[in-house]
């Protein structure tokens, strides 16, 4: 083997780890960029507005007890994201503003709508998959037993309050749509709201249906 070839071979083995690192780094950079682009698509900086208002959902939930205001506030204070003046008003006074979802309020809305979904009386909770798969122990799911911001035990509020009045057609629309929306965290449809994201999304669908949203 010639000296030149030896040098090339030696150089290959010496540089191979660094080359591999460089290739891996480029792949990781590309993957991160792709993830960032996807995140921007599903959670844009400008946010997006849905055709529904908060109205008196907040006061209703505080009145029912599914939200203990002190516990709710403390949760956000502990995470260094204290509730804003507007968020406190949504909870205590209600709001006629349309609901805008953005990066700044997504954590607030997750818990807000989790409570709505848990407390709102609906066929999904009374007769749906969560009852079927719960086998008499519906309170064992993360979306039910995992709710810790209520006055008493979470199942005391399960499907107990008519927070979002819906006519039969609107409830049927929710049941039609929720079975086709799957969550990447657990690969279950919203028709089976066994986690907090599923319960929150169920509430959003119910609120939109009550505001005459269509399937499209």
Residue ranges and their predicted role:
Residues 1-10:
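Hydrophobic membrane-insertion alpha-helices, especially the h-region
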Residues 15-35:
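Ser/Thr/Pro/Gly-rich low-complexity linker/stalk segments immediately outside membranes or between
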Residues 10-11, 52:
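Intrinsically disordered, low-complexity segments enriched in small/polar residues
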Residues 37-199, 214-215:
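Acidic/His-rich structured neighborhood in mature extracellular/periplasmic domains
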Residues 202-210:
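Short glycine/serine- and small hydrophobic-enriched flexible loop segments
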């Amino acid at each position: 083997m010639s000296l030149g070839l030896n040098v090339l071979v030696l150089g290959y083995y010496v540089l191979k780890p660094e080359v591999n690192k460089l290739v891996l780094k480029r792949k990781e950079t590309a993957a991160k960029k792709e993830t960032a682009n996807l995140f921007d698509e599903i959670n844009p900086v400008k946010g997006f507005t849905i055709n529904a208002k908060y109205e008196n959902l907040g006061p209703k939930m505080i009145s029912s007890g599914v939200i203990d205001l002190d516990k709710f506030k403390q949760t956000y204070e502990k995470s260094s994201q204290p509730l804003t003046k507007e968020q406190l008003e949504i909870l205590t006074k209600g709001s006629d503003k349309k609901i805008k979802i953005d990066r700044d309020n997504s954590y607030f809305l997750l818990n807000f709508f989790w409570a709505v979904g848990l407390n709102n009386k609906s066929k999904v909770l009374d007769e749906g998959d969560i009852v079927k798969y719960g086998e008499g122990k519906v309170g064992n799911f993360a979306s039910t037993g995992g709710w810790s911001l209520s006055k008493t035990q979470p199942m005391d509020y399960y499907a107990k309050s008519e927070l979002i009045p819906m006519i039969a057609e609107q409830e049927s629309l929710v049941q039609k749509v929720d079975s086709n929306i799957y969550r990447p965290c657990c690969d279950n449809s919203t028709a089976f709201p066994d986690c907090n994201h599923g319960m929150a999304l169920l509430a959003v669908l119910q609120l939109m249906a009550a505001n005459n949203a269509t399937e499209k």
